[in-house]
A protein has these predicted regions:
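N-terminal beta1-alpha1 cap of cysteine-dependent amidohydrolase-like domains
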Residues: 1-72, 76, 83-90, 94-120, ...
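Catalytic beta-strand/loop module used to bind and position nucleotide/cofactor moieties
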Residues: 161
């Protein structure tokens, strides 16, 4: 049965996300809502988050969380999850953003993320906002050497967030010097298979 994943549409280019979802046999649906809930929700990278998330994004995350459907947050998406669960963000952290391309840096991972990418993955990042105070129910699973949070999981829900960009480091885009981003999307596939909707 087809498993659809809603990619939250923030008006950006989602080609890499769509390609990697198809590579793990998931069907991407780009929009701010779908007819009924999909099997999973993907919150992609994007622009800055102000003090509050847009109401339609809050409603969408709330619907997927209430239905215990898997949610994957990438870069801005991880930050959005943290804000949704009551956390806060630093407006600007140095050393994690460049004008073009990504910064590669070493991290430490534990728990679910260590199972996916190992305990000392090198990851690709490009961001200037970062988690300050962690949201309710969230646990840190990955850190950069400077202490910036690079990965989170929810204690009860199938929610995973990464500050880095696995879609730029998976399948045809994979570079040998960084963690295999495909593992994150295989996680989403496994979670979607456990899900009856989509």
């Amino acid at each position: 049965m087809e498993k659809r994943v809603l990619i939250w549409d923030d008006g950006l280019n989602y080609v890499n996300y769509m390609e990697v979802l198809r590579a793990v046999d998931l069907t991407p649906v780009v929009g701010r809502e779908a007819a009924g809930l999909c099997a999973a929700l993907l919150l992609p990278g994007g622009g800055d988050i102000a003090d509050r998330l847009p109401e339609d994004e809050i409603r969408t995350i709330r619907a997927y969380a209430a239905a215990e459907k898997p949610i994957l947050g990438i870069c801005r998406g991880m930050q959005a999850l943290n804000v949704f669960f009551g956390g806060t963000l630093y407006a600007r952290v140095p050393g994690h953003q460049v004008k073009a391309g990504d910064i590669l840096h070493d991290t430490r991972a534990v728990g679910e993320l260590a199972e996916l990418v190992g305990t000392a993955p090198r990851v690709n990042s490009n961001h200037h906002q970062a988690i300050c105070r962690l949201g309710r129910g969230l646990g840190v699973r990955q850190w950069a050497a400077d202490g910036v949070i690079e990965g989170i999981c929810h204690s009860r829900l199938p929610v995973l967030g990464v500050q880095w960009h696995p879609e730029r480091q998976a399948f045809a885009l994979r570079r040998g010097e960084a963690a295999d981003g495909a593992a994150v999307f295989w996680w989403l596939r496994r979670q979607a298979e456990k899900n009856s909707g989509g």
